[in-house]
Amino acid sequence: MTKIMFFGTRAYEKDMALRWGKKNNIDVTTSTELLSVDTVDQLKDYDGVTTMQFGKLEPEVYPKLESYGIKQIAQRTAGFDMYDLELAKKHEIIISNIPSYSPETIAEYSVSIALQLVRKFPTIEKRVQAHNFTWASPIMSRPVKNMTVAIIGTGRIGAATGKIYAGFGARVVGYDAYPNHSLSFLEYKETVEDAIKDADIISLHVPANKDSFHLFDNNMFKNVKKGAVLVNAARGAVINTPDLIEAVNNGTLSGAAIDTYENEANYFTFDCSNQTIDDPILLDLIRNENILVTPHIAFFSDEAVQNLVEGGLNAALSVINTGTCDTRLN
């Protein structure tokens, strides 16, 4: 019987993975561990592997997989910056991802957390906790219909996000290296700088690559409309985090919502309540009253989880049976 290892299993995924295995007559083994130099030897007798990595995969893993006859790694996220695609190709390993598993879920998160900032929820909560129930200018907001929203990256998720904002009556502008001119609700701009210069809300939906690395840094923040809010539900590396904190502290941004953080791998998805966090930048984010931090959960809905579980397993099985899959990256 074909055997697939399901690394990075969370409690809510296990039954889904095992049901898929039973339905497809595949022996699926679940493990809470991630694929690494320490766990790769577990794959000696397996035909395929799916995992959900967040940190960089060590280069030593690729030749090990090749030596065991494994031809693929099925990543259960849209992001794939944790893999060296050329090194994987050298060792005849196909890397796949899941480019679309519930774009509406991430779009809904992006809009809802932006609304928390626009409606001054962090300030309101602080005042209520202090038993200050007065109405005052620090908690006065503006309706979204009077705002301009910049969507940076107009793929499936960015497009879904922009459509929601258009439903509020907002003016929606966008930037993408490959514009989708069928998006009638959105006005494209030639550059990121041009897209954000008049935006009250900036929503990031770009992949992590050499062109987007620290795209939003001090130089980019110089182009931001004073008092704008920024939401990053894309990849952490898109933002230079110290520069973001500075932009919030000096009033360039009135607030930010961060669902992905460039150094998140050691913390996000783990319970760190009984340990010391040795990351002063992450602590600065968490402690900042005008920054909302969530642990990479924009995608987290029942629909998305099922699509990720089944998508990863389907991709692994496809490579095992046919030598390729529809979502291969190299």
Curated annotation (Swiss-Prot):
NAD as UniProt keyword: yes
Residues involved in NAD(+) binding: R156, I157, D176, V206, P207, A233, A234, R235, D259
Swiss-Prot/TrEMBL catalytic activity: (R)-lactate + NAD(+) = pyruvate + NADH + H(+)
Entry-linked PROSITE patterns: D_2_HYDROXYACID_DH_1 (PS00065), D_2_HYDROXYACID_DH_2 (PS00670), D_2_HYDROXYACID_DH_3 (PS00671)
EC number: 1.1.1.28
NCBIfam families given in the database record: PRK08605.1 (NF006374), PRK12480.1 (NF009127)
Record-given protein name: D-lactate dehydrogenase
Species, as recorded: Staphylococcus epidermidis (strain ATCC 35984 / DSM 28319 / BCRC 17069 / CCUG 31568 / BM 3577 / RP62A)
